[in-house]
């Protein structure tokens, strides 16, 4: 989940 806030890592 690299969308912005949850997949920021």
Swiss-Prot record:
GO terms for cellular component: extracellular region. Its main location: secreted. GO terms for biological process: neuropeptide signaling pathway. Keywords: Amidation, Neuropeptide, Secreted. It is found in: Secreted. The modification Arginine amide is found at residue 9. Transmembrane segments: none annotated. Myoactive peptide. Increases the amplitude and frequency of spontaneous contractions and tonus of hindgut muscle. This is Tachykinin-related peptide 2. It comes from Rhodnius prolixus.
């Amino acid at each position: 989940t690299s969308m912005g806030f949850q997949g920021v890592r």
